[in-house]
UniProtKB/Swiss-Prot annotation:
One of its GO terms (molecular function) is efflux transmembrane transporter activity. Residues 275-289 have a biased composition (Gly residues). It comes from the Bacteria. Part of the tripartite efflux system PvdRT-OpmQ required for the secretion into the extracellular milieu of the siderophore pyoverdine (PVD), which is involved in iron acquisition. This subunit is an adapter protein that stimulates the ATPase activity of PvdT and connects the inner and outer membrane components. The system is responsible for export of newly synthesized PVD after the final steps of biosynthesis have taken place in the periplasm. The keyword Transport applies. This is Pyoverdine export membrane fusion protein PvdR. Residues 108-180 form a coiled coil.
Length: 391
């Protein structure tokens, strides 16, 4: 009987102490809830940047075309060859141009012979006129004969001037024909690498309406990235801003450079661009209709001394607006607006309960933000505001 009473008394004491034990345990352990995740404030580095896709192109290149019509007799280079300024690249059959030059020279020779004949005629006409003047002084000739001799002398003098003008005209035509003959031998306008060949030996070129393109020469260093930046981010990109990029084949290597230029107008689609115009990014300026995306072209120059970068490579570009190292950082998702133009974070206090703190932040990337004031290293933050809070 005594054992039964003792047992009941122990159970009664346990029931009375259970709430006190639960309260003490709740206060002793940190705040936990299945509805919230916590993260810690830690030190790290943040880079505020704008990302974009781009295409690599040689900064300096020239398209070599033909100014003379005819069949390509010899092509002296292939794609990938290094050339020097003045090197012979292409020979075009010069038969037609050579015939024009020969005809021009023969025409000049004929005109010179005619000029010599007229000079002889002028000498004779002048002598006859002088003779008539002497006869007229003695009254031995008529006035009409003197006038006729004078007219003959002046006419031959005029023909001399006419032939001289014709010779000058023929010489000008000959220079034009000789220049066209020179166009049948095409030389490198600059030193560089042949990056494309668009013609073949035996191909006939017609340069009457437009210049046929034969090949392209480019300097492979420096290269230029033609990056496409959305209109939402273009305001953050400035000339002279540092930038870096990676390529698919670069195995994580970073190439660095600076923004050289921001083109003020988005590139036109290919169907709106003039032939031979546009840019390497033409056609990517956006879509028509309400879903149109406007992209602006930003040019970044980069050294390519080791020739690891090639034309038309795709580049993932990052324009660096600001950087900070060894700073307090917190996840962007853990920072909330307080509704008054400020920012707050919910910190798990020493008693395990969430506390609201006013904070001040600096630069941020897409994941973390710099903490300037209000938090300390190691603080535990709630990723979401607790139930019942104003934030």
């Amino acid at each position: 009987m005594r054992r039964t009473r003792s047992t009941r008394r122990a159970l009664l004491v346990a029931v009375c102490l259970s709430p006190l034990i639960a309260l003490a345990a709740w206060q002793a352990y940190p705040f936990r809830s299945n509805n919230f995740d916590t993260v810690s404030v830690s030190r790290g580095s943040i880079e505020s940047s704008v990302s974009a896709l781009g295409t690599l192109q040689p900064r300096r290149y020239v398209d070599v075309g033909a100014q003379a019509s005819g069949q390509i007799r010899k092509l002296h280079v292939e794609a990938g060859d290094d050339v020097t300024e003045g090197q012979l690249l292409v020979e075009i059959d010069p038969s037609t141009q050579q015939a024009k030059v020969d005809a021009g020279r023969y025409s000049i020779e004929m005109l010179k012979a005619q000029l010599a004949e007229q000079r002889a005629q002028y000498t004779l006409a002048r002598q006859q006129y002088q003779r008539q003047q002497r006869l007229a002084a003695g009254g031995a000739t008529r006035t009409e004969d003197v006038q006729s001799a004078q007219a003959q002398m002046l006419a031959t003098q005029a023909r001399i001037e006419m032939y001289q003008a014709q010779i000058r005209q023929a010489q000008a035509s000959l220079r034009s024909d000789e220049a066209e003959l020179g166009y049948t031998r095409i030389y490198a306008p600059m030193s560089g690498t042949v990056v494309a060949v668009d013609a073949r030996e035996g191909q006939t070129l017609n340069a009457q309406q437009q210049t046929p393109l034969i090949l392209r020469i480019a300097k492979l260093s420096p290269m230029t990235v033609w990056a496409q930046v959305s209109e939402a981010d273009i305001g953050r990109v400035k000339p002279g801003m540092p930038a870096y990029f990676t390529t698919l084949s670069g195995e994580g290597r970073r190439w660095t450079g600076k923004v050289r230029q921001i083109l003020p107008v988005p590139p036109k689609p290919l169907d709106q661009s003039n032939q031979g115009g546009g840019s390497p990014t033409s056609g990517s300026g956006g879509q028509s209709g309400s879903g149109r995306v406007v992209l602006y072209t930003v040019l970044v120059d980069v050294d390519n001394g080791d020739h690891q970068l090639m034309a038309e490579m795709t580049a993932q570009v990052f324009f660096v607006a600001a950087t900070a190292e060894n700073i307090l950082t917190a996840p962007v998702a853990a920072i909330h607006d307080d509704g008054k133009g400020g920012q707050v974070a919910w910190v798990v206090g020493s008693n395990g309960k969430p506390q609201s703190r006013q904070i001040r932040t600096g630069i941020s990337d897409r994941l973390r933000v710099q903490v300037l004031a209000g938090l300390e290293e190691g603080d535990r933050l709630l990723m979401a505001a607790p139930d019942g809070s104003d934030s």
